[in-house]
Every structure is written in C-alpha cells, then in structure tokens.
Amino acid sequence: MATIGEFTLHATDGKARTGVLQTAHGPVRTPIFMPVGTVGSVKGVAPDDLDAIGAEIILGNTYHLYLRPGDELVARRGGLHEFNAWRKPILTDSGGFQVFSLSGLRRISEEGVEFRSHLDGSKHLFTPEKVVSIQRNLNSDIMMVLDECVPYGADKDYTARSLKMTTRWAQRCRDAYPAGSGGNLMFGITQGGFFKDLREESIGELTRIDFDGFALGGLSVGESKTEMMDILYHTAPMLPAHKPRYLMGVGTPLDIINGINAGIDMFDCVLPTRNARNGTLYTSAGKINIKRREFAEDDGPLDPNCSCYTCRTFSRAYLRHLFHAQEILSYRLNSIHNLTYFLDLVRGAREAIAQGTFAEYKSRYDAIYPQEAALCP
C-alpha cells in the first residue's frame, strides 16, 4: 500500500518527468494541472464536471476561505472535501499572495502579516502558525507555507531581507506541523525575486527543512516572458529531484509546456476559467474569441479534436449566442472546454514523457503559439 507523501518517478525525458504523488485522498499523476477553486468551488463548474473531464486535484484559497465562510465553520462541516463534495485531493495556498496583493491594507513584521479584510475592513493577523492552523481546519491534502511574494521591481536589498524572513516563516510552519504528523502534506515555497543568487540561496535554505514538496513562487508577477523563463529554467532543476516541484500561478499552455520541459510537476492558474468567462477559448489551432461575428452561423464544434461535453454537443454558433445573451450556461460550457484543454495538455505530456517523445510534443505547442514560443527557450 502506498504511503501518503510518497512520490514515485515513472519516466524522464530530458528534464521532463512523469510520476505519481500519493495523498490522503488518492494519487495525483504528474505533470498535473490543478483547476483553481478560490472559495471552495471552481468557477462555473460542479465537482461532477471536474470528475468527468479528468481533474485529479483542485486548489483552494486559504485567505478567501478564512474570511468567508471561515475555516472553523468548514472544520465543523468535516473539512473542505465534505463541504464542497470534492472527494479527490485538494491543495490550499497559504493566502500570502492575496494578502500581499492588498498593498496599503497590510503591514509586514517578523511575527507575520497584519491586514484588513477586503470584505468589511476588519483587521486580521496571519502568522506562519495561523496559516497552518487554518489549512488544517480545511483539511487540505497539501498545505503551503506562509511566504512573502515580493513585488516585481523590488531591489536586491529588500528581496534579500524578505527572503531571510520567508525562510524563518517556513521553518515556523514546519515546526507547527512536523513531518509525519498526519495526512496533510506541506510544501515549501522558494522565493528570491529575479536575482539568481538569491533564488539559489532560497533553495539551499528551504531544502534543509523536511518539506514534502517544493514550489517556485514569485513568478508571473509582472515580469516579461523572457525574465520568467530565465528564472524558471535556472532554478527548477535545482529543486530536489525526489520531491514534487510546483510552479505557482503559471500560466499559459506554453508556460506549462516549458515548465514541464524544465522539470516542474505541478501547475495551477485561473486562466482557463477566467478566459472562459471572457469568451476566449483554447483549441488545437490556437485561441479563438467566441464573441466574434464570424461564428454567428458556424455549425461546427468548438474544437473538432476535443472530446469534451461542450465540443461533442454544441456548435460555435450556439456558444456565441449564449455568450452574447449573458447566459450562465455559457460560463459552464466554456469552462468545461478550457479546463479540458489544459488537462489534456498535461495528460498528453505524461504520455509523451513515458514514450520519450516530449521534445516533439513541445514543438507542437510551439507551433500553435509561435509569438509566445519566440520568447521561450
């Protein structure tokens, strides 16, 4: 019987890897894309929809769930899996990114970060110990440590000071929940901005702490694609090879392909569902905007190469009509398709790595998104 936290690599192709991470709520095959369920639900879709399209793990947001409905209320309901009826694994972030995005509404100290709720202005304090407590109440399969995500453009002195504090916070998180304490896994988050030596320092310090996996944080925060790829390809291979590697909040299909190429195992992003609500849909021929007049009488499927419910059942003309009529069904059908696209991408990557053909697989996506590919290795 597999042990919770066990990460087994099944194949590699260059730096790309495929394997399985065992969690309390089942296995997660990597590389994997995690749909984002900020407040406990993935926008526009139900758990049955997610199950039908092959989602294996979703993400919840500690900050938002703490403020509403409250982590203690969720705990009284039996945890987030019971509360939202998603029986497979859940990863919760620490809420740090959201808190630091509040800018003028927060204050950072060694103790933690004090902030005011965006809902009612009430004052709160997130300490490393507090965010662990919240996530244990949520009973997520994977908990993330509290970290400071420094803003893009922060100077090296500030980034270095922030990094040292983030490392101390990471140790406090682990002290609050030692390895092997229960069924919840805990990942550390490497930081360091866009300074390679600080990134290396962060990895060196964090890997001395016994985390179950490691994340690259602080990317996709306003930098250019070239800058992001430079840090990604430099740092990803430095993360422990025997632990899962997670690229937080990134990104486009080509970002994910490049992340896999650099040795990353796990991804999350709001892009597929956010773009679905805006009418931007991903297809095997690239992105299309379903709002456009050219689709008004198009009886063909959204993507003839996709087998999702949306593509099997409805025409582009109908999807365009739903969007312009502002029907809620539009959000659901578009989200089902976009999420299927992202999940098919990582499913195909797993197969290509196992077959030793990932370079060829990557080249297909480079051809679909040539302008973006020109900015990537």
From Swiss-Prot:
Native source organism of the sequence: Oleidesulfovibrio alaskensis (strain ATCC BAA-1058 / DSM 17464 / G20)
Entry keywords, A to Z: Glycosyltransferase, Metal-binding, Queuosine biosynthesis, Transferase, tRNA processing, Zinc
Residues annotated as catalytic: 93 (proton acceptor), 268 (nucleophile)
GO terms of molecular function: metal ion binding; tRNA-guanosine(34) queuine transglycosylase activity
This protein's pathway: tRNA modification; tRNA-queuosine biosynthesis
PANTHER family reported for this sequence: QUEUINE TRNA-RIBOSYLTRANSFERASE (PTHR46499:SF1)
Protein known as: Queuine tRNA-ribosyltransferase
Cofactor binding summary note: Binds 1 zinc ion per subunit.
Protein's job: Catalyzes the base-exchange of a guanine (G) residue with the queuine precursor 7-aminomethyl-7-deazaguanine (PreQ1) at position 34 (anticodon wobble position) in tRNAs with GU(N) anticodons (tRNA-Asp, -Asn, -His and -Tyr). Catalysis occurs through a double-displacement mechanism. The nucleophile active site attacks the C1' of nucleotide 34 to detach the guanine base from the RNA, forming a covalent enzyme-RNA intermediate. The proton acceptor active site deprotonates the incoming PreQ1, allowing a nucleophilic attack on the C1' of the ribose to form the product.
This protein's record includes keyword tRNA processing: yes
Subunit details: Homodimer. Within each dimer, one monomer is responsible for RNA recognition and catalysis, while the other monomer binds to the replacement base PreQ1.
Disulfide bond entries: none
GO cellular component: cytosol
